[in-house]
Amino acid sequence: MAEKVNVCIVGSGNWGSAIAKIVGANASALPEFEERVTMFVYEEMIDGKKLTEIINETHENVKYLKGHKLPTNVVAVPDLVEAAKNADILIFVVPHQFIPNFCKQLLGKIKPNAIAISLIKGFDKAEGGGIDLISHIITRHLKIPCAVLMGANLANEVAEGNFCETTIGCTDKKYGKVLRDLFQANHFRVVVVEDADAVEVCGALKNIVACGAGFVDGLKLGDNTKAAVIRLGLMEMIRFVDVFYPGSKLSTFFESCGVADLITTCYGGRNRRVSEAFVTSGKTIEELEKEMLNGQKLQGPPTAEEVNYMLKNKGLEDKFPLFTAIHKICTNQLKPKDLIDCIRNHPEHM
């Protein structure tokens, strides 16, 4: 890497802006980093003014993180290649569906020895069905290593400076330290593990379980039932990783990316909220998305669909009754009230 490490944040939504507060402060304070951090901002007009200009003049992302000042060394750039061309570390934090297109734009335009880290929770659809990990897509397209950062990190709470933990999954030890230095803060504690695939898979699977937790809330079944759904969800997450990404360590599931993120998503988070409304309102998931999420997309139902495709292919649906039932409820093959019958005789109880 260059003498001073250049950093670019690809994305400037709610989570991207929250992480920019930490990364910007660290780049400014630590001698190994170049102070100026570029942040790719999709250009849009806010009250007749460009969003990048507003951010660079007021140091606030008024659209996605209102009321929080960004460090003055974080510079909004509307051109993706311009933002990324000098970076030694590329932080990807955009909705996962943009990744293939962004990678095409960046191919051959970035430093060949750069590294990436993905903060993106969710999968892409693999060709022919099933799931493709975002970090794998980035590595495949850009021919650079890609670590992941996942944890119980609701963006607004991170921006507020409330204490939390996060997990970095990085298969190559030599990058672990520089990544930890970049993200670690007094209120944002980082644990680095080598089990990158398990860290990333946890970040996507927990959204399925959160839908189940939301159904339980909508049915008003109480805390004991919700705890059972969360526990069985964790067991199915562990089993899924065991089947499709063998070689992972059990201890990874007890890091922030696993059990902690699962809990926070099943009590807060949009997948839970919309799933509860799905039960109480009688509206479709699509209608509720439009009404409740201000243009954001739910990750739980599409992830459940891809996971179900993989389980079906291996004849494993009956070994994952919670994942299977949640998928069937999201696609109207089952009623929400059928959820409990589906998990009453879970393989865990046999």
UniProtKB/Swiss-Prot annotation:
Residues annotated for NAD(+) binding in this entry: 11-16, 98, 121, 155, 270, 299
Protein's cellular compartments: Cytoplasm
Pfam families, alphabetized: NAD_Gly3P_dh_C (PF07479), NAD_Gly3P_dh_N (PF01210)
PROSITE patterns: NAD_G3PDH (PS00957)
EC numbers: 1.1.1.8
Disulfide bonds: none
GO biological process: carbohydrate metabolic process; glycerol-3-phosphate catabolic process; glycerophospholipid metabolic process
Active site: 206
Entry's family note: Belongs to the NAD-dependent glycerol-3-phosphate dehydrogenase family.
NCBIfam families assigned to the protein according to its UniProt record, in alphabetical order: glycerol3P_DH (TIGR03376)
Name the record gives this protein: Glycerol-3-phosphate dehydrogenase [NAD(+)], cytoplasmic
Organism: Drosophila ezoana (Fruit fly)
Name of the encoding gene: Gpdh1
